């Protein structure tokens, strides 16, 4: 077959590097082709659809899909495979690759100026939430959660929004794996209580957490959907309990928060057609 030219790889003279056949890893090529195929709009793909899309046998497609699922880059409902937010960790890390952080940041800035509170966007990565974008007002006393912060999903408002968006079997698996430890006296630590709260989140389309993650911290979150209607992230506004009551959080902060999440959704649909 001869040498292959790698895309974007240049030698010291600025010429494309010729990659020998022996150095070309077909399984990596196949895995990236699968990710690319699943990145197109729609509700995921079956094994047969992936095989047709990338031009391989069903057996080969199945092995690649199961490998990527095992590594956490895909999820499946037993028939169709879809991408997971773990892809945010590829490339240059959680801040590159997908457009979410760049799209979200100006909207978070506007939300912060409206509410004068800490604002962020997080995704579900494994059993934890991962902060991918954030802004905060310039105050001595503030909520400290830099980009890259990981938190237990069950005890955070963004986590509950993301858990509420999971398929039933995915949520069952999460609840089987995770120990619901009390982080404060207010933390919900039983599966029935958490399920009831997730049902409430689905109905009202936002979550409020009152000092369950940390004493003195109240926060709200709203879902961010992709073009297929799946919950892919959550926007959050957080405040010190001494500044904001739960009633004020619901009345004054949740409406602009939900509007912000919807604005991010619209811009994401344009950025990732």
PLM regions: where:
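Short, solvent-exposed recognition segments
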Residues: 2-8, 13-14, 140-215
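N-terminal helix-turn-helix
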Residues: 2-101, 262-270
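Amphipathic alpha-helical effector-binding/dimerization core
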Residues: 82-178
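Short hydrophobic beta-strand micro-motif common in sensory/regulatory domains
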Residues: 218-222
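Sensor-regulatory modules in signal-transduction proteins
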Residues: 224-227
